[in-house]
Design a protein with these regions (language model features):
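Sequence-level preference for short, compositionally simple segments enriched
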Residues: 1-301
């Protein structure tokens, strides 16, 4: 698809809509030519097994934000502000920028991911507050070699999500993550070999604060810039959260790595038993995006 008419479709949504519902035996690959596509994109649950592959410079953008009015004069809300919604399982995206262009206006989501078994490779997620919403409690998501930027709680939600070799960039003081992991869930957010950087004006950043009491976030072998505060972790102003969250690090390095000064309710892991990427994402069906890439397809009976 291309904006200049050289493809089969002019918009990404037109291409998505053309995919047969529940096409279970094969993946559908959509090539997005270079360009900025301003549209509120929805990938519904029936459009399974889709791969979106972008040329360099393929940008999907919109300018919604929580306090913006919808057609009925109501506030969009955080969930309604997203530029892109992904509900279809076994979705794959590569080399695409997902952007919310509304600026520093409060909650403004770039990508809302509700589907299970979602894989992003070499993608960018641009925004300020609440950039990436890992929405569903049943969702597993894998981010590889991605760039994610924001200010406050810019990676947040209920899902189990792995971030492998990602670049996480803070634009202002705030919080990198705000997980809302369910009680009893084995994994929340796990970051492997990621690099955390910041704009010069961002000097007071926490790794996480718990949106819900049983939040989980683990940083493994990550390089932390000096913008990360020595205490590292925040309890969202609720002392009782310190008894229920699971916040941990393993072999953090860089100017922001300060294990001796970390919050007392956080942990320094002694080993990685149970924290292999394949274990974190396996679920009951053995999903392994590292080995299988985007070849897996949904089986619908």
């Amino acid at each position: 698809m291309a904006q200049d008419g050289s493809g089969d479709f002019f918009t990404v949504q037109e291409a998505i809509n053309a995919v047969p519902d529940f096409r279970k035996d094969v993946r559908t690959t959509i090539l997005i030519r270079k360009g900025t596509y301003k549209e509120k994109l929805i990938i519904p649950e029936s459009k399974i097994n889709i791969s979106l592959i972008g040329e360099d410079g393929a940008i999907l953008t919109y300018d919604g934000f929580a306090n913006k009015k919808n057609v009925f004069g109501e506030n969009m809300g955080t969930s309604g502000s997203s530029s892109c919604y992904i509900y279809a399982p076994d979705f794959y995206a590569e080399n695409i920028t997902f952007e919310n262009s509304s600026g520093p206006v409060g909650q403004a989501v770039a990508c809302f991911v509700s589907a299970d078994r979602v894989y992003f490779k070499n993608c960018r997620f641009l925004g300020f507050q609440d950039t990436l919403y890992t929405y569903s409690k049943q969702s597993r998501q894998y981010y590889e070699d991605c760039y994610i930027e924001g200010t406050v709680d810019f990676i947040f939600g209920w899902s189990t999500a792995v971030f492998n070799r990602c670049h996480i960039h803070s634009k202002r003081d705030g919080y990198v993550t705000a997980p809302s992991t369910d009680k009893g869930k084995k994994y929340g957010y796990v970051f492997y070999d990621c690099r955390l950087t910041a704009e010069p004006e961002a000097t007071k950043v926490y790794l996480s604060r718990p949106w819900r009491p049983y939040a989980q976030a683990v940083f493994i072998r990550c390089e932390l810039g000096k913008h990360i505060l020595p205490i590292g972790w925040n309890n969202w102003g609720k002392k009782e959260n310190e008894k229920t969250v699971f916040y941990a690090e393993y072999e953090s390095r860089g100017e922001g790595a300060n294990p001796k000064a970390r919050a007392a309710f956080s942990q320094q892991l002694k080993n990685l038993q149970g924290y292999e990427i394949t274990t974190v994402l396996a679920g009951e069906d053995g999903w392994n995006p590292v080995a299988d890439g985007n070849k897996l397809i949904t089986v619908k009976r």
